[in-house]
UniProtKB/Swiss-Prot annotation:
Identification of the protein by name: BPTI/Kunitz domain-containing protein
Organism: Haliotis asinina (Donkey's ear abalone)
Primary location class: secreted
Stretches that traverse the bilayer: none
Disulfide bond keyword on record: yes
Length: 126
């Protein structure tokens, strides 16, 4: 159970709010804004804060996505849990089941089919 909680917390790093921490250093970093689904710049104070901070925009996008999370590849992550999840396959334009390992991975990872469909539904003009 403890490992599961740790993995779940690590997976949710992209959902954490921007947190510069209480210190007053000036360290420009990036965080994932879960409302806009974009990696954005912020100034980290140098201590405390949370794990939603990345040295480069590329690191942020690799971990959390950026802009179009539905275009990210399926990524089970390196851990070995067997958690049923859904991912959006842009090639087939469908949400598909996959087995999530419980840590890391990317933002194209949904708990339910409905959540996947809601996030990645096609924007049609008809």
């Amino acid at each position: 159970l403890f490992v599961g909680l740790t993995s779940a917390k690590y997976h949710d790093v992209c959902q954490l709010p921007r947190d510069p921490g209480p210190c007053r250093a000036y360290i420009p970093l990036y965080y994932f804004n879960s409302r806009t689904c974009l990696c954005e710049k912020f100034v980290y104070g140098g201590c405390q804060g949370n794990a939603n901070r990345f040295d480069t925009v590329e690191d942020c996008r690799r971990r959390c996505g950026g802009g179009d999370l539905c275009s990210l590849p399926r990524d089970s992550g390196p851990c070995e849990a067997a958690i049923p999840r859904w991912w959006y396959n842009k090639r087939t334009n469908r949400c598909q089941r996959f087995t999530y390992g419980g840590c890391e991975g990317n933002a194209n990872n949904f708990k339910t089919l409905d959540e996947c469909r809601f996030q990645c539904r096609k924007r049609s003009t008809y």
